[in-house]
Each structure stands twice: as C-alpha cells, then as structure tokens.
C-alpha cells in the first residue's frame, strides 16, 4: 500500500468512516449508450428457442433482457437467419451426414446443422415477445444457398459483406452492443467482425445464450477477448 493510501485510510478512520470503500475499490460507473451506439439483437427467432428446429438451451431467456436494455438505445438493428431449402449448411443436403458433423466447402470447414430458419416459415420468424419498436433495420443472412452466414457483417466466406458496416458508419456509429443467439456462433462472429470493421464492441453476456458444441463457448470468449471485444452484463448498462 502506498503512503498516500495509508494517509487516506487513516483520515477516514479518524472521521469515523469505518466501512467506507476507498475510491479505487469502487465499481466502475454504468455505461450510458448515446447516439453513436447501436444495439444488435442477433437471431432471436423461433428456430433458436425452445420448440424450434435448432434450439439453444434457455434461448428464450434472452428476450426480456434484450427488451429491457433496448430502451437505452436510439439505434437498434435486428438480424434474422434466413436460409433457403436445402441450404449448404444443412446436414440433410448431404448423403450420410448427420447434424453437428462437418464438411468442407469452398470457404473452409462448415458445421452441418439440422434444417432451420427456412425462409417464410414460422420457425424463421422473430420471437413473438421480442419488442423492439424503435429497430431501424433487419439484416437477413444465410440466404445464399451455398454459403453460410453467422455474422451480421460478413458471410462465412469472409469476403461477402452484408452492408451493415457501411450503414452504421454512415450514421456515425462508433460502439456496438451485441446480444442474442448463439453466443459461440452468430454473436461471436458478429462481435469479432464489428471489431475488424473498427467499432468498439461489447457483448452483453446475460442477453445471450450458447450452443457450446465441443467447447465452442470457451473458445469463442477467448477469441473475442483476443480481438478486443469487451464482455459485460446487462446491469452494466444504464437504463432509464
């Protein structure tokens, strides 16, 4: 302990300030999103919650959290997985392949999923309780039949942009807050691509849920941290 800290503690004791926390021990102030911040709600769809075709455990629990913190944001973007029938990411498109196995596509290794979020189906609709009336944009992704898309910013081939980066930059957005499903896939890819595009990025952990396939959640957090993505809780955001 430094001399200055000893003096401060001694002074507090002399004033009867027992139990008062020293300034450097106090919690950081809450984050207040401004006009240059955006909330992205990733793939909060029927297919990814209980009863869907590719359910994420406790996926519906993100809905009230996202609804609550959304009131702190002027700018909101929603993404929607929007696959064609027989999509290249579906295990059913290959003889002898099962969901969660992998295959090689032109852009690299692809996890094969159960058929999910097929365009125009109820399964692909946004969760009925997701309430984001001030959302300004819906990004539909994964609609190219031969290319999967986890990120809101870039297709899985790492060369086909969705246009979201340009849209946000035109509006002066500097900071991105990512929520939704699933933490270790679409949320993580969105967060890392946002960092690559030059944005400050926060992932709101309790506003996300993960698939956690063969350690994918721990790997995702590690990869996000390495890219400079910050991990926070919804309580860290000033609402109201």
Residue ranges with predicted function:
Residues 1, 23-41, 45-48:
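C-terminal segment of N-terminal export signals and the immediately downstream linker at the start
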Residues 188-196:
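Histidine-anchored nucleotide/phosphate-binding helix
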Residues 77-80, 202-207:
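Short internal beta-strands
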Residues 205-217:
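Short, flexible loop segments at boundaries between secondary-structure elements
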Residues 49-58:
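Acidic/histidine-rich helix-loop elements
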Residues 64-175:
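Active-site alpha/beta core segments
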Residues 131-132, 215-240:
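Structural recognition of alpha->loop->beta junctions
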Residues 7-27:
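N-terminal export signals
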């Amino acid at each position: 302990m430094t001399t200055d800290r000893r003096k401060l503690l001694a002074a507090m004791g002399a004033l009867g300030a027992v139990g008062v926390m020293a300034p450097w021990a106090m919690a950081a102030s809450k984050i207040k999103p401004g006009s240059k911040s955006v909330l992205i709600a990733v793939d909060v769809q029927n297919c990814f919650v209980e009863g869907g075709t590719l359910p994420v455990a406790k996926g519906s629990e993100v809905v009230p959290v996202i609804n609550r913190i959304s009131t702190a944001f002027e700018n909101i973007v929603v993404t929607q997985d929007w696959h064609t029938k027989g999509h290249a990411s579906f295990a059913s498109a290959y003889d002898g392949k099962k969901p969660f196995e992998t295959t090689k596509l032109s852009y690299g290794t692809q996890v094969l999923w159960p058929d999910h979020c097929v365009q125009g189906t109820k399964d692909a609709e946004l969760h009925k309780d997701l309430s984001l009336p001030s959302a300004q944009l819906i990004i539909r992704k994964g609609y190219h039949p031969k290319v999967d898309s986890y990120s809101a910013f870039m297709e899985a081939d790492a060369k086909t942009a969705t246009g979201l980066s340009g849209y946000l930059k035109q509006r002066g957005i500097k900071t991105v807050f990512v929520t939704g499903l699933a933490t270790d896939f679409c949320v993580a890819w969105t967060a890392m691509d946002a960092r690559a595009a030059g944005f400050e990025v926060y992932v709101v952990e309790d506003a996300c849920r993960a698939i956690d396939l063969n350690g994918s959640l721990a790997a995702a957090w590690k990869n996000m941290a390495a890219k400079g993505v910050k991990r926070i809780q919804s309580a860290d955001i000033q609402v109201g």
